[in-house]
From Swiss-Prot:
Molecular-function annotations in GO: 3-phosphoshikimate 1-carboxyvinyltransferase activity
Localization in the cell: Cytoplasm
UniProt-listed HAMAP family: EPSP_synth
Active site positions: D314 (proton acceptor)
Swiss-Prot/TrEMBL GO biological process terms: amino acid biosynthetic process; aromatic amino acid family biosynthetic process; chorismate biosynthetic process
Protein name, entry field: 3-phosphoshikimate 1-carboxyvinyltransferase
Keyword Acyltransferase attributed: no
Record-linked NCBIfam families: aroA
Cysteine disulfide partners in this protein: none
Presence of keyword Amino-acid biosynthesis: yes
Matches recorded under Pfam families: EPSP_synthase
InterPro entries according to UniProt: Enolpyruvate_Tfrase_dom, Enolpyruvate_Tfrase_sf, EPSP_synthase, EPSP_synthase_CS, RNA3'P_cycl/enolpyr_Trfase_a/b
Complex and partners: Monomer.
Source lineage: Bacteria, Pseudomonadati, Pseudomonadota, Gammaproteobacteria, Aeromonadales
Length: 427
């Protein structure tokens, strides 16, 4: 196994141009494939999850040209749902942003499609989405364990009507259904059961659908109305924003020990994870907002916070390691959906934070972190989870080094993360 040891960092300073957002990249690629016309996507993320989506689209008959650096892609839209006279097998790795939306889109399509992934993907739930799709006439069969991939879809179209979808575990199920709904044969009314988690991710979906010509009405995120029999229309060009979750590591570093600016997102970003900067501000950092940048600066000792972070689940992980540098006990609440991500992130974060000396309470849907007087050097297990690897790089901002096991797992969303982190680090 590869390891990377980060020596203590005296100060961070500089500017980081963010890679494209994973959430935005895969949504836009799928809609570009279904849309009428040709779409040029710029600042596309080059990472494993995007590669799985691109490979799937190619297998499904979508033609596209990818630039040499893989950050620009011209997609020739089908102007309709997918169709295949032969059975199709798609391997989607551990990419939830490919598995869930493609599952819904393929229910609209003609043909037989089998979706598989890595072993972890077989532990990531998809039942709430499949239940909703079946209500709209889909034929989906689980191949191993009920409620989880792999699965086979007999594509025969979706008929619309009223559908109830559980919103309490992941917003990706609703996102997937929403993106497929305009191509259903009738109008769709989607009612949410339970509390809808990660609402800002639904806003991303609605915003991108609008750019491709489809408007969705909703009653306070409880009922969504989508007209059927529509066709997505290419906007011509589509700029993928910088990834706000990826920004969190650099902003936290600036808040802890220096001054860092991230570019590619700003105050008008469509991504809810920019609200992470507000949490840093509550902890005592100085935050500056621009149209195309966010800057975080340390202006004194950070203070612990006790907050509900349901709306920013990915970026909230970064608060868990920033808490190692805060005065007092930090509590991150209402984050049950950490448990259904790339790994069970609640247990994983608790385990690794204890290794560096923190006192940690792990609850069903919360975590409490009290920093030690002195951080300890530890080898951090990353659980094939990109965000755990990136979060724990912040430990090096102390006077203690940190070793990251399997640092290459950041390739899921940010292949050159450690190079970029080194570019703002002074030793």
């Amino acid at each position: 196994m590869n390891t990377l040891t980060l020596e203590p960092i005296a100060r961070v300073e500089g500017t980081v141009n963010l890679p494209g957002s994973k959430s935005v990249s895969n949504r836009a690629l799928l809609l570009a494939a279904l849309a009428r016309g040709t779409t040029r996507l710029t600042n596309l993320l080059d990472s494993d999850d995007i590669r799985h989506m691109l490979n799937a689209l190619k297998t499904l008959g979508v033609s596209y040209e990818l630039s040499a650096n893989k950050t620009e892609c011209t997609v020739h839209g089908l102007g309709r749902a997918f169709s295949s006279s032969e059975p199709v097998n798609l391997f989607l790795g551990n990419a939830g942003t490919a598995m869930r939306p493609l599952c819904a889109a393929l229910c609209l399509s003609n043909g037989e499609f089998t979706l598989t992934g890595e072993p972890r993907m077989e532990e990531r739930p998809i039942a709430h989405l499949v239940d909703a799709l079946r209500q709209a006439g889909a034929h989906v069969h689980y191949l191993k364990k009920d409620g989880y991939p792999p699965l086979t879809i007999e594509g025969k179209g979706l008929w619309g009507g009223e559908v109830v979808i559980d919103g309490s575990v992941s917003s990706q199920f609703l996102t997937a259904f929403l993106m497929a709904a305009p191509l259903a044969s009738g109008d769709v009314r989607i009612r949410i059961r339970g509390e809808l988690v990660s609402k800002p991710y639904i806003d991303i979906t609605l915003h991108i659908m609008k750019q491709f010509g489809v408007t969705v009405e909703h009653d306070d995120y409880q009922v969504f109305y989508v007209r059927g029999n529509q066709t997505y229309v290419s906007p011509g060009t589509f700029l993928v924003e910088g990834d706000a979750s990826s920004a969190s590591y650099f902003l936290a570093a600036g808040a802890i020990k220096g001054k860092v600016r991230v570019t590619g997102i700003g105050k008008n970003s469509i991504q809810g994870d920019i609200r992470f900067a507000d949490v840093l501000e509550k902890m005592g950092a100085k935050i500056t907002w621009g149209d195309d940048f966010i800057e975080a600066e340390n202006v004194g000792e950070l203070q612990a916070v006790d907050l509900d972070m349901n709306q920013i689940p990915d970026a909230a992980m970064t608060i868990a390691t920033a808490a190692l540098f805060a005065n007092g006990k930090t509590a991150i609440r209402n984050i049950y959906n950490w448990r259904v991500k790339e790994t069970d992130r609640l247990t994983a974060m608790a385990t690794e934070l204890r290794k560096v000396g923190a006192e940690v309470v792990e609850g069903h849907d919360f975590i409490e972190i009290t920093p030690p007087a002195q951080l300890k050097h530890a080898a951090i297990d990353t659980y094939n989870d990109h965000r755990i690897a990136m979060c724990f790089s912040l430990v090096a901002l102390s006077d203690t080094k940190v070793t990251i096991n399997d640092p290459g797992c950041t390739s899921k969303t940010f292949p050159d993360y450690f190079t970029k982190f080194a570019s703002v680090s002074q030793r």
